[in-house]
């Protein structure tokens, strides 16, 4: 079974965590920006159903 030869240094561990947190923060910022764009109604890049009442049954 494969095992690590030496203990990972604290600096390397912190560097990996910082990279993960930075990536997560950027994705969260993108998601928030996207949500604001959709809610403001100024977005043209999304296609979703409008709240139109259609009376096709008559």
Swiss-Prot record:
GO terms for biological process: translation. It comes from the Bacteria. It holds the Pfam family Ribosomal_L32p. One of its GO terms (molecular function) is structural constituent of ribosome. One of its GO terms (cellular component) is large ribosomal subunit. The keyword Ribonucleoprotein applies. The keyword Ribosomal protein applies. SUPFAM superfamilies: Zn-binding ribosomal proteins (SSF57829). Residues 1-22, 39-58 are annotated as: Disordered. Keywords: Ribonucleoprotein, Ribosomal protein. NCBIfam families: rpmF_bact. Belongs to the bacterial ribosomal protein bL32 family. HAMAP family: Ribosomal_bL32 (MF_00340). This is Large ribosomal subunit protein bL32. The lineage of its organism: Bacteria, Bacillati, Cyanobacteriota, Cyanophyceae, Oscillatoriophycideae. The gene is rpmF.
């Amino acid at each position: 079974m494969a095992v690590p030869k030496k203990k990972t240094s604290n600096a390397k561990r912190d560097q990996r965590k910082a990279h993960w947190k930075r990536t997560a923060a950027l994705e969260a910022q993108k998601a928030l920006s996207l949500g604001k764009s959709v809610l403001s109604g100024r977005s043209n890049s999304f296609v979703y159903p409008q709240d139109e009442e259609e009376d096709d049954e008559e």
